[in-house]
């Protein structure tokens, strides 16, 4: 007789106890926790309004799923919501240890697979090798192209970004502990500061992660204090998300270039960072180091995972010259879970260690 313990089930709980059901995935090592059920309705006429509503009224959901004991300080999540855009198959709000992002490329790559496999888009016709999924992110509509076989996702996913552009180059910033440091700022659905790790006395491939995090965080705080971020479309998008340290190999080569992204509250991306690759391609194109449709490979110094990226066409974002960037990578499922929240648990809303 099969043991009752062999079949996973929820522990005894009161009928009114909140239950949060999720699917967990990762893209290049960076986790994505997708909420299937248990999140209250997120109100608002637009996706950005829904993002504000969730921050103000439902932030306990983020903390419960991202923080310990159910998550960890580097957990990443997605809440699926209806979109006001007629062409969108789904809308998404991105969750992290500090709050809510405007864009997440690794999540889009994972959500492309998820949307196809879980029936959020119409089943592709027989023989279709790639399905299209329109995902409304807070930064705008992003199209994912999902490799498929017999109607199921199979292999890598690629996406086309919102217009990506450069906000500033060769910006001198006074970084405590490092003196004057030259940084570039570019947008790939979120704004990043880019710095060659060597300028901070670090080797991107061999330095301790803690040292890279400390240096990148110092740059982020310095840029926030000394430079105003602006976005032509919305103030909701006008914030510095983090700093990406690179190996400085921005000139075109077929060899991978290595970087690490530190974002939000010192959160470390395990992947090469999809929106960061988008912004870095825009920066390289802006500097004349890259031509349209020249493919580059980007390697995570954290896990060694690789994304590819290329600028596919020119565009505009307000008065900024921009490019649409294609980013490719592969996401994998890791499991499902159902979490309960007991009223008498003093740590029910989560905690973080630093």
From Swiss-Prot:
Q: Which UniProt keywords apply?
A: Lyase
GO MF annotations for this entry? hydro-lyase activity; trans-L-3-hydroxyproline dehydratase activity
The cross-references to InterPro entries, in alphabetical order and at most eight, read: Pro_racemase_fam
- pH-dependence of activity, as noted: Optimum pH is 8.0.
The active-site annotation reads 104
Reactions catalysed according to its record: trans-3-hydroxy-L-proline = 1-pyrroline-2-carboxylate + H2O
- Pfam families, alphabetically? Pro_racemase
Enzyme Commission no:
4.2.1.77
Which tissues express it?
Answer: Ubiquitously expressed.
Is Lyase there in the keyword field?
A: yes
Q: Give the domain of life.
A: Eukaryota
Q: Which residues bind substrate?
A: 105-106, 269, 274-275
Presence of keyword Repressor: no
Q: How does it assemble?
A: Homodimer.
Query: What is the annotated role of this protein in its UniProt record?
Result: Catalyzes the dehydration of trans-3-hydroxy-L-proline to Delta(1)-pyrroline-2-carboxylate (Pyr2C). May be required to degrade trans-3-hydroxy-L-proline from the diet and originating from the degradation of proteins such as collagen-IV that contain it.
Anything further noted? In contrast to the T.cruzi proline racemase enzyme, lacks the conserved Cys at position 273 which is replaced by a Thr residue, transforming the racemase activity into dehydratase activity.
By sequence similarity, the record places it as follows: Belongs to the proline racemase family.
Could you tell me what this protein is called?
Trans-3-hydroxy-L-proline dehydratase
Q: Native species of this protein?
A: Homo sapiens (Human)
């Amino acid at each position: 007789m099969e043991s009752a313990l062999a079949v996973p089930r929820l522990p005894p709980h009161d009928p009114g106890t909140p239950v949060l059901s999720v699917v967990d995935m990762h893209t290049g090592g960076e986790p994505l926790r997708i909420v299937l059920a248990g999140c209250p309705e997120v109100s608002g006429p637009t996706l950005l309004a829904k993002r504000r509503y969730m921050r103000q009224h439902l932030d306990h959901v983020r903390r419960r799923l991202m923080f310990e004991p159910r998550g960890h300080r580097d957990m990443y999540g997605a809440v699926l919501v209806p979109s006001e855009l007629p062409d969108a198959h789904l809308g998404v709000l991105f969750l992290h240890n500090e709050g809510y992002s405007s864009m997440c490329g690794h999540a889009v790559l994972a959500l492309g697979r998820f949307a196809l496999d879980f029936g959020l888009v119409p089943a592709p016709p027989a023989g279709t090798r790639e399905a299209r999924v329109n995902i409304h992110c807070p930064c705008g509509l992003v199209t994912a192209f999902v490799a498929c076989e017999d109607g199921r996702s199979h292999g890598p996913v690629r996406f086309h970004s919102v217009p990506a552009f450069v906000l500033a180059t060769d910006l001198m910033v006074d970084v405590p502990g490092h003196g004057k440091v030259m940084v570039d700022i570019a947008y790939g659905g979120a704004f990043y500061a880019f710095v060659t790790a060597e300028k901070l006395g670090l080797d991107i491939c061999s330095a301790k992660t803690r040292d890279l995090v400390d240096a990148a965080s110092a740059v982020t705080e310095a840029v926030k204090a000394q430079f105003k971020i602006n976005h032509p479309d919305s103030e909701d998008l006008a914030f510095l998300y983090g700093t990406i340290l690179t190996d400085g190999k921005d000139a075109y080569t077929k060899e991978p270039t290595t970087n690490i992204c530190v974002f939000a509250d010192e959160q470390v991306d395990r992947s090469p960072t999809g929106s960061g690759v988008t912004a870095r391609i825009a920066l390289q194109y802006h500097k004349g180091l890259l031509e349209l449709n020249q493919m580059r490979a980007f390697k995570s110094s954290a896990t060694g995972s690789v994304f590819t990226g290329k600028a596919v066409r020119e565009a505009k974002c307000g008065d900024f010259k921009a490019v649409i960037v294609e980013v490719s990578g592969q996401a994998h499922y890791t499991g499902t879970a159902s979490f309960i929240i007991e009223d008498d648990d003093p740590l029910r809303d989560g905690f973080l260690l630093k």
